[in-house]
C-alpha cells in the first residue's frame, strides 16, 4: 500500500535527500524545506521504497502538494 507524503506548509525545496528506488526507514528525512528562514525536514511516516519524488530543489510548494510516494 502506497503512502503519499504531502507538504504541510508553503515552502521552498532546499534539498531532496532521497531518490526514487531508495529503501528508507520510518523517520528518515525525505526532503528539506525552507520557510521563513527556517529549515524544516520532511520525514517518512512509514518504512518502504520511495516510488516517486514529485519535487526538485528550488520548487515552491503549497500546503497539500505531493512531495513523494512511499510504497
From Swiss-Prot:
Annotated S-S bridges: none
Gene3D superfamilies reported in the protein's UniProt record: 2.40.50.100
Domain Biotinyl-binding: 2-71
Keywords carried by this UniProt record: Biotin
PROSITE patterns in the record: BIOTINYL_LIPOYL
Location of N6-biotinyllysine modifications: 37
Matches recorded under InterPro entries: Biotin_Carboxyl_Carrier/Decarb, Biotin_lipoyl, Single_hybrid_motif
CDD domains cross-referenced by the UniProt entry: biotinyl_domain (cd06850)
Record-linked Pfam families: Biotin_lipoyl
Record's keyword annotation contains ATP-binding: no
Name of the protein in question: Biotinylated protein TB7.3 homolog
Organism of origin: Mycobacterium leprae (strain TN)
Amino acid at each position: 500500500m502506497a503512502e503519499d507524503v504531502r507538504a504541510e506548509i508553503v515552502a521552498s525545496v532546499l534539498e531532496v535527500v532521497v531518490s526514487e528506488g531508495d529503501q528508507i526507514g520510518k523517520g528518515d528525512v525525505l526532503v528539506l524545506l525552507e520557510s521563513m528562514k527556517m529549515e524544516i525536514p520532511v520525514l517518512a511516516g512509514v518504512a518502504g521504497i520511495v516510488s516517486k519524488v514529485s519535487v526538485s530543489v528550488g520548487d515552491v510548494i503549497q500546503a497539500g502538494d505531493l512531495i513523494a510516494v512511499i510504497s
